[in-house]
Amino acid sequence: MAQKDVLTDLTKVRNIGIMAHIDAGKTTTTERILYYTGISYKIGEVHDGAATMDWMEQEQERGITITSAATTCFWNDNQINIIDTPGHVDFTVEVERSLRVLDGAVAVFDGKEGVEPQSEQVWRQADKYDVPRICFVNKMDKIGADFYFSVRTMEERLGANVIPIQLPVGSEGDFEGVVDLVEMKAKVWSADAKLGEKYDVVDIPADLQEKADEYRTKLLEAVAETDEALLEKYLGGEELTEAEIKGAIRKLTITSEAYPVLCGSAFKNKGVQPMLDAVIDYLPSPLDVPAAIGHVPGKEDEEVVRKPSTDEPFSALAFKVATHPFFGKLTYVRVYSGKVDSGSQVINSTKGKKERLGKLFQMHSNKENPVETASAGHIYAVIGLKDTTTGDTLSDPNNQIVLESMTFPDPVIEVAIEPKTKSDQEKLSLSIQKLAEEDPTFKVHLDQETGQTVIGGMGELHLDILVDRMRREFKVEANVGKPQVAYKETIKRLVEKVEFTHKKQTGGSGQFAKVLISIEPFTGEDGATYEFESKVTGGRIPREYIPSVDAGAQDAMQYGVLAGYPLVNLKVTLLDGAFHEVDSSEMAFKIAGSQVLKKAAAAAHPVILEPIMAVEVTTPEDYMGDVIGDLNSRRGQIQAMEERSGARVVKAHVPLSEMFGYVGDLRSKTQGRANYSMVFDSYAEVPANVSKEIIAKATGE
């Protein structure tokens, strides 16, 4: 079969992601998959910075994967489209985004560490999108690797119903291969098969026979319970066939009732091919997952369903935008239904704009295979889309649909950035625009008071990498300020009937608007932070001016009353007002709306909110006291303490403002033996003494 054919038989297609904690060996695993499926001829190692999937210079330097490139490969006449997802917590947006377009995933775990904090987080995100998974316990050759411990951590920490379908043969340096519990044979890689292309199928070693029987029984019990006929057969003492067992495991996996567990060592080239077989055997094809659901543009309540068939109208979701050195903007799309040829016109139904599809490619890391047609169930890169950004839907102009978009968190950390020269100024705005297209969690605004450009992101590493990309890809020389916390302001109590009259009389037509509002704390169910309601009756304010009051109020919310941070979580109710036949205008009511909101907010017990991070520190027992003391001194609240593979884990909620430079402090307190991870948890009110400092700093007193 030619490499560049796209399979139209969707039962043979798998769209999968490989998800894991930073160092569980995700990129290495992906590399091996590409090697054994015959695309990459030289195995790339992350250690040497030569991995095929890590295509930005920085990824190769830091040895972590930032952009999820989509890669296509073939295995035994099946086509696998892999989306590489980053494991670092600052890149959760990339992970969420890739999960949205996957049908299944391989969760890679470190055989020594088992489930780590980050793996927990990625696992929960996959739960959110209901992604079926198989688990691969990697690094079985590492000293201290323990398959059974890893499986236990999956049950305890993830609460997952896992079914081992393989057991390791040997461990650490003597790791040779796996026992296949479905076929009841051992698969071993001999020492002379350097790159592990060949493995031998042999009888199960005698010392493992008992363990294999025990786990085989567990597997069969789980399998038998999926189906009445199998249960009868099993209870009647008959052997279940290999096909019956595989079919049942597939059923359990696709419904996310259970997660098969395999093991191996990608770095030592052992266990990768059986894992590929498991991807085909157990993970869903585009036909096994629910059809895509969306709504008619502009009508949220009119639901539309698109099945993964080429006979349906075309629909696709853009899940990533990347900048390519030659082609400019590359948009990665998952086609959910229908088919479309390159050069066709489609509509971006999210934004209501027409787009023309230039060239279509299926990607291999950063090499491209051009294709003529994009069809349902596959992932493509497209050139030539102008207005499409992450999360937008493309559809057939005559049958429009908006697929559910993705939700992105607000930035929690900001830095001011100043170009060094006039020419850098232009490059800076171009680079910011490009990066914002690629990454929706990267936000930019102009600080009105200082005139500086401020960029915001999900963490220090996230901003470091963005600034670094500006330097490398766009050659921007800029001075970067110290990271600042993204504070917000809100109100604590209801204030009724605040009025404001805006009038100006300077010859000619004046300006006049009078408004009366009440203001109260508010949190929407869908996470909305603002609501406007008009209770004006009897035309006291003409209908066309009411949106202006709303717009004015929202303008005023950009700069809070205490320290100029954005105001959130409030509801404005417009009660009454007055207008003047000649002097009233939209502008007058906008100004009135803006001023009355400031006046009301100042009276509604305003407070400052700060981002609180969920911090998890893993430390040897000896340093436990120091770590806890240090977290307490950072205004941390200890949530839980537990033991994890001989180390202690402290979970705490700590304000982000207290976490700057924590890496260094933790190293020196624990002689480099502890590590930590942190992820945004929520916004909470700042204590009064800290609030005073923040206000004093902001108002320059």
UniProtKB/Swiss-Prot annotation:
Protein task: Catalyzes the GTP-dependent ribosomal translocation step during translation elongation. During this step, the ribosome changes from the pre-translocational (PRE) to the post-translocational (POST) state as the newly formed A-site-bound peptidyl-tRNA and P-site-bound deacylated tRNA move to the P and E sites, respectively. Catalyzes the coordinated movement of the two tRNA molecules, the mRNA and conformational changes in the ribosome.
Listed Gene3D superfamilies: 3.30.230.10, 3.30.70.240, Elongation Factor G (Translational Gtpase), domain 3, P-loop containing nucleotide triphosphate hydrolases, Translation factors
Originating organism: Mycobacterium marinum (strain ATCC BAA-535 / M)
Gene designation per UniProt: fusA
tr-type G domain ranges (all copies): 11-287
Record-level GO BP terms: ribosome disassembly
Binding-site residues, GTP: 20-27, 84-88, 138-141
Pfam family for this entry, one: EFG_IV
Protein name: Elongation factor G
NCBIfam families documented for this protein: EF-G, PRK12740.1-5, small_GTP
GO MF terms, alphabetically ordered: GTP binding; GTPase activity; translation elongation factor activity
Main location: cytoplasm
Family to which the UniProt record says this protein belongs: Belongs to the TRAFAC class translation factor GTPase superfamily. Classic translation factor GTPase family. EF-G/EF-2 subfamily.
PANTHER family attached to this UniProt entry: RIBOSOME-RELEASING FACTOR 2, MITOCHONDRIAL, TRANSLATION ELONGATION FACTOR G-RELATED
Subcellular compartments: Cytoplasm
CC annotations in GO: cytoplasm
Keywords for the protein's UniProt record, in alphabetical order: Cytoplasm, Elongation factor, GTP-binding, Nucleotide-binding, Protein biosynthesis
